[in-house]
């Protein structure tokens, strides 16, 4: 199938390779061969050239801009605005001015059964049963009534699938989730299995309830229900919280319960530390353990990634060369990690040189390699260069995927070239790579940034029509854009839609809603949602507490602050508790002063 006409306009050159070479071989403060050297080594019984990095040179690299003046890519014809093409009915709201129109042509082009975002549990559980249970938990937990007694009266046919689905619905609300989990454990004839335990472990890990998490892990150990996933959840949680010693301590628990600590387990921990920007700590751990196991390609790759994430290219180069010295040939994954590391460290010219070496000496760049480069060019608004790389990828026989197109869509959308965005979406369909969840989220973000929430809603509806499940991030973006535009009714309608779809609000969801309600002047309603957050054990939202408190202060209602202070203190939110307690005192003094004056 032929490419979209506008793409050909970017190919004004005798050869894609020739044009790219103009970008790849550019002037720099030092010679490319000095930066990246190749040495002949015998790998696997045959002589091959290996790329080596001169780590010392990283300390004196001078960033050389590779941007070239670019012109706007003309289109052969004008197109309608993107939102008109994706238009369909928005969220239900009495005052909504969202168009009910729908472009049938685009609808027919956007068939996509790929689901992203909220994870779905494959089970035979009746959705209505899940809904009933969640409704009871929602209504009775917040009111502090006997939730367990009502659940008992429901005479549920408990199954592991039901437990997992309910926990999934409350994955951001640890207190109701844990209370339901404990209630289920006490039901006669039911016992948790590894899957339900791991679901609860994930919730505790995400909310950093480490003491409870370890207790659950040990309980699993006594029942013989531990799996490698259990330990992985705990290791990743401690690493994400930068608790290196506790993460390493999971090894001791593995030994206690007779689990083998192999290279995969060590790689998992090193990777978790690296992703938490603890590259140095990952290296120290590796140096302590390297005599006890045989590192493989993945081991060096995760170490490389850890150093690249903290922008330490000298150590990254050392790991790279270490890998080669141990007889391992860096694969395409390692090369892509290094590409990202160079770009993250603002060494664009050096990333381009490495990319050129990959094309000439191997491993040949894959779609991920091109995506890394194109994404960076798009971030810098160097769209013509991004198109050059896109064309070269196609000419190399690689099929662009939704991720590459999403980068281009974001780049052109940021420049407000919505006609070009529309053409890209059209081409995605024609090439058999329809938009996925991330593409739709990128489009919604573009609309939100341009303060066009109604158009974001239309894109959301298109997403639903194409059977792509929205993520919590999708709803948060749309809800925030409506509140920013002071369309409070539609902002609340988005919240209602999210709850209706069974998506558990996270900390950001509550923060957006509470800020919107305060801005609307509905501090009492905002107070109700703040109490709900505290009751669920969620983080205290970052809001203007002084503005929030001033409304109640003027009304002379100190008991509201006292209640909030007590709830915050009980939930361990001591800073917020102090703020509420201070406002309670101020309000009481004011009330007393008024009484004396009267």
From Swiss-Prot:
Gene3D superfamilies documented for this protein: Tetratricopeptide repeat domain (1.25.40.10)
The organism's place on the tree of life at top rank: Eukaryota
Range annotated as the organelle transit peptide: 1-98
Alphabetic keyword roster: Mitochondrion, Repeat, Transit peptide
Localization in the cell: Mitochondrion
UniProt xrefs under InterPro entries: Pentatricopeptide_rpt (IPR002885), PPR_P_subfamily (IPR050872), PROP1-like_PPR_dom (IPR033443), TPR-like_helical_dom_sf (IPR011990)
Keyword Mitochondrion: yes
PPR repeat residue numbers: 193-227, 229-261, 262-292, 296-330, 331-365, 366-400, 401-435, 436-470, 471-505, 506-540
Keyword Repeat among UniProt keywords: yes
Any one GO cellular component localisation term in the record: mitochondrion
SUPFAM superfamilies: HCP-like
Protein family: Belongs to the PPR family. P subfamily.
Protein name (database record): Pentatricopeptide repeat-containing protein At5g14820, mitochondrial
Species of the source: Arabidopsis thaliana
């Amino acid at each position: 199938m032929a490419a979209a006409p506008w793409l050909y306009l970017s190919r004004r050159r005798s050869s894609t390779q020739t044009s790219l070479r103009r970008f790849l071989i550019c002037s720099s403060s030092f010679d490319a061969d000095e930066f990246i050297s190749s040495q002949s080594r015998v790998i696997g019984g045959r002589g091959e050239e290996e790329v080596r990095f001169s780590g010392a040179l990283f300390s004196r690299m001078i960033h050389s801009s590779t941007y070239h003046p670019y012109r706007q890519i003309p289109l052969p014809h004008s197109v309608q605005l993107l939102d008109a093409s994706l238009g369909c009915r928005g969220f239900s709201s009495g005052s909504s001015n969202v168009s009910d129109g729908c472009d049938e042509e685009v609808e027919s082009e956007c068939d996509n059964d790929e689901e992203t975002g909220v994870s779905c549990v494959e089970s035979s559980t009746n959705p209505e049963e899940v809904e009933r249970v969640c409704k009871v938990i929602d209504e009775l937990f917040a009111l502090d009534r006997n939730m367990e007694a009502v659940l008992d009266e429901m005479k549920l046919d408990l199954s592991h699938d039901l437990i997992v689905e309910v926990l999934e619905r409350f994955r951001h609300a640890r207190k109701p989730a844990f209370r339901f989990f404990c209630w289920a454990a006490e039901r006669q004839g039911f016992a948790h299995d590894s899957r339900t335990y791991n679901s609860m472990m994930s919730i505790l890990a995400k909310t950093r309830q480490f003491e409870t998490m370890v207790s659950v892990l040990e309980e699993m150990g006594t029942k013989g229900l531990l799996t490698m996933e259990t330990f992985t959840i705990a290791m990743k949680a401690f690493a994400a919280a930068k608790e290196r010693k506790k993460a390493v301590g999971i090894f001791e628990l593995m030994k206690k319960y007779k689990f083998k600590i192999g290279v995969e387990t060590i790689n998992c921990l090193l990777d978790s530390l690296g992703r938490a920007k603890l590259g140095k700590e990952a290296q120290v751990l590796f140096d302590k353990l390297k005599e006890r196991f045989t590192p493989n390609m993945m081991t060096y790759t995760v170490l490389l990634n850890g150093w690249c994430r903290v922008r330490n290219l000298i150590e990254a180069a050392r790991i790279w060369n270490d890998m080669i010295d141990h007889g391992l040939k860096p694969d395409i994954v390692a090369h892509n990690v290094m590409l990202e590391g160079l770009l993250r460290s603002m060494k664009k010219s050096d990333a381009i040189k490495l990319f050129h070496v990959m094309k000439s000496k191997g491993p040949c760049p894959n779609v991920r390699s091109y995506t890394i480069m194109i994404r960076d060019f798009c971030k810098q608004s160097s769209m013509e260069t991004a198109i050059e790389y896109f064309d070269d990828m196609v000419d190399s026989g690689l099929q662009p995927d939704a991720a590459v197109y999403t980068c281009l869509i974001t780049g052109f959308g940021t420049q407000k070239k919505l006609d070009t965005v529309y053409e890209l979406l059209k081409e995605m369909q024609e090439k058999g790579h329809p938009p996925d969840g991330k593409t739709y989220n990128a489009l919604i973000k573009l609309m939100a940034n341009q303060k066009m929430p109604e158009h974001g809603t239309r894109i959301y509806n298109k997403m639903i029509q194409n059977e792509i499940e929205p993520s919590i991030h999708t709803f948060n973006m749309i809800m925030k854009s409506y509140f920013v535009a002071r369309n409070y009714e539609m902002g609340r309608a988005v919240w209602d839609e999210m709850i209706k779809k069974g998506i558990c609000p996270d900390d950001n969801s509550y923060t957006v809603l509470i800020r919107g309600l305060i801005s609307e002047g509905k501090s009492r309603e905002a107070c109700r949602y703040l109490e709900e957050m505290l009751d669920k054990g969620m983080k205290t939202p970052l809001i203007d507490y002084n503005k929030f408190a001033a409304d109640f202060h003027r009304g002379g209602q100190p008991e509201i602050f006292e209640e909030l202070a007590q709830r915050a203190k009980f939930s361990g939110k001591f800073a917020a508790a102090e703020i509420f307690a201070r406002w309670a005192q101020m309000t009481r003094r004011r009330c007393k002063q008024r009484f004396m004056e009267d």
